[in-house]
Amino acid sequence: MIRETLTTELAALKKQGLQRQRRTLQTPCGVRIEVDGRSLLSFCSNDYLGLAAEPTLIDAAREAALRWGVGSGSSHLVSGHFTPHEELEHKLASFVGGERALYFSTGYMANLGVVPALVGRGDAVFADKLNHASLIDAVQLSRADHQRYPHGDLTALERQLSASKAKRKLILTDAVFSMDGDLAPLTQLLELAERYDAWLMVDDAHGFGILGPQGRGTLVQYGIVLAEHPRLLYMGTLGKAAGVSGAFIAGAEEVIEWLLQRARTYIFTTASSPMLAATLLKSLDLIAGADGDARRSQLQLLIARLQDGLQGSRWQLLPSPTAIQAIIIGENDAALRVAAALAEQGLWVPAIRPPTVPKGTARLRITLSAAHSLADVDRLLAALQAAQ
């Protein structure tokens, strides 16, 4: 009976165009890849700076593996916290302007650990409706009252905050929204957090390494100094622009110490490999240096080329200043057909469907990388025009 039920539900997913399939890459992460025996130009990775296969980082990983091995063997609070972990946390805190940072295995685990450590029954979380799934799951796990406000609607958010009688309040938002590419109004959100005595947690998975001077993130882009706002928490991921793996939370000393004591996804899991932490130290040097500046400049050229090339065409991009450039198609089947047409021309652009995006907003999610060339973008533009 159980198997039959799942078989029926899987068939329903397939009929709705919602069944997902994995594609197996036979080459390292990059813009030119081999998938299922086919050579493709990829526009779907979050490797925004092209660091995932950067030779300098590969060399750093090799040296770190020889020095530290490949596993940690334990949780951070037992015997799995190594010198590279400690050095990375100090460097991350300094990089984003926080008092202290805590290194997690993934961004999903960071969000899932932080929210329930800060709020629970009797508290309230105010969340943008387009927040990442990990933030939604984190609120549900916390058992706090979950109030969602329309995307970017500060008036609605203030109305919810002013009416709340919760003991503790937490405003939760993506900094760069992963499926649209637009930015949250962080300055105004911080003002509301201060006015209504709430925490503000910012998930900068898609802004860290890209936005702000030296890629220091979306807070710095807005001129917000993390260390000056004890109620502010910052989450950044290290497997996208940084090209490696993991995530971190940065904020006030007391907040990070509390998370170390209470964030279950930090406490009760084996620590990430010290090899990865050591590699990330080198990645941060690249991000903050002249090489990182050159990669970010290249990314801006590519974004402008794509946006200019689609002006006046059938394909209208959502407004976004970031590497995430989305074209709304609408129906699931239509989005899949366009993605398939692009694949026929050797381009991998994924069709994103519900539940990742709201129903009726299936889209092509184009992600650009500094490893792309202008000629690569021109090839995509030509293929999109042909797909009309």
UniProtKB/Swiss-Prot annotation:
Reaction(s) catalysed (UniProt annotation): 6-carboxyhexanoyl-[ACP] + L-alanine + H(+) = (8S)-8-amino-7-oxononanoate + holo-[ACP] + CO2
Cofactor: pyridoxal 5'-phosphate
Pathway assignment: Cofactor biosynthesis; biotin biosynthesis
Classification via HAMAP family: BioF_aminotrans_2 (MF_01693)
Protein family: Belongs to the class-II pyridoxal-phosphate-dependent aminotransferase family. BioF subfamily.
Keyword Transferase: yes
Keyword hit for Metal-binding: no
EC number: 2.3.1.47
Cited InterPro entries: Aminotransferase_I/II_large, AON_synthase_class-II, AONS_Archaea/Proteobacteria, AONS_Proteobacteria, PyrdxlP-dep_Trfase, PyrdxlP-dep_Trfase_major, PyrdxlP-dep_Trfase_small
GO biological process, one term: biotin biosynthetic process
SUPFAM superfamilies xrefs: PLP-dependent transferases
UniProt KW keywords: Biotin biosynthesis, Pyridoxal phosphate, Transferase
Gene3D superfamilies: Aspartate Aminotransferase, domain 1, Type I PLP-dependent aspartate aminotransferase-like (Major domain)
Role played: Catalyzes the decarboxylative condensation of pimeloyl-[acyl-carrier protein] and L-alanine to produce 8-amino-7-oxononanoate (AON), [acyl-carrier protein], and carbon dioxide.
Amino acids binding substrate: R20, H132, T356
Binding site residues for pyridoxal 5'-phosphate: G107, Y108, S178, H206, T237
Gene Ontology MF terms in the entry: 8-amino-7-oxononanoate synthase activity; pyridoxal phosphate binding
Stated name of the protein: 8-amino-7-oxononanoate synthase
EC class (word): transferase
Modified residues (N6-(pyridoxal phosphate)lysine): K240
Subunit record text: Homodimer.
